């Protein structure tokens, strides 16, 4: 069962869920991927926290992660690019695989882009300021 740490914003969670449904070759309802979705839009705003203008959402993210695991999630995803600023902290002590939207995006780009290609990132000001994608690009080579 996949645990979805979502609600930041809710439409990103809905978009992720729809993409999983469309990518599943299900012949009937019971053939779909089981998911637990936590959609909590009350989690502290990520952009403000990254820019030093608000409180950190990390305690709420950790609580959501732990709730999903306690409810039976066997793997986790978080369909919010900006929240991946806290991804390293969310991995600490995590007892199930936690997939990174940033790692997955960059690995997919590596297959699609030709050597020497320029790639642009459309993201929030905070995501760009935090260099979430830049740091992962360096880490993954």
Give a label for each model feature.
Residues 1-141:
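Non-catalytic structural scaffold of enzyme domains
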